[in-house]
Amino acid sequence: MIFVTMLLNACALKTYENLSPPTKEPSLNNNYFITSDGTHLPIRKWKSSEPIPKAIILAVHGFNDYSKFINVAAVFFSRNNITTYAYDQRGFGAAPNRGFWAGVKTLTADLLSLTLLIRARHPKTPLYLLGESMGGAVIMVALKDAHEQARDLGLRGVILSAPAVWGRQFMPWYQTTALWVTAHTFPRAKLTGRSLKIKASDNIEMLRALNKDP
């Protein structure tokens, strides 16, 4: 059994894409957040209704999602003089290496770098981080490990929406085993959930919009 598992692992496609060695200073333009290893991560911005926003929100999406997840809320925030930023994390949305897991250290390093760039762009405006599901987990881990940078980040607060807090260490062995085998044997498999015959929401307009979103 062990031998067969090793063979399967050897034949499986790569599932990880870690942070490369730093080659440049992180930067931010209208379309991309460019990381320290030169990776271009797409970024969206919803400007506040007034020239000077009363607050800034950096939104971090969840697993199998991307930066547009915050669109409805960001439009509301904009009308209330709040500017919102959101970016596609590595492996998600239009970011490079879609489908590959970048690793916790890489995702948190990206978040901290982008937070510092936004803080530098808006030095006197209250800055908040907003994370949904996996995005909430990325924020929590990043801030836990960022004691030395905490003052430079200058955060006014954190907003967590259904943060992902159930890690593998709390899962029974059969779940972690199934996840590992599936990820290393069928890394490109797509799970749609269609066979479950469950309606995700009674908001038909929202479901249609999601269906049309590439």
Give the predicted meaning of each segment:
Residues 74-98:
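Conserved alpha/beta-hydrolase
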Residues 134-214:
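Alpha/beta-hydrolase-fold enzymes
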Residues 53-62:
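Short beta-strand element of the alpha/beta-hydrolase
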Residues 6-49:
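An N-terminal hydrophobic leader/cap segment in hydrolases
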Residues 63-75:
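The serine-hydrolase catalytic nucleophile loop
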Residues 64-67, 92-126:
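Catalytic nucleophile-loop/oxyanion-hole region of alpha/beta-hydrolase
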Residues 60, 87-89, 161:
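Alpha/beta-hydrolase
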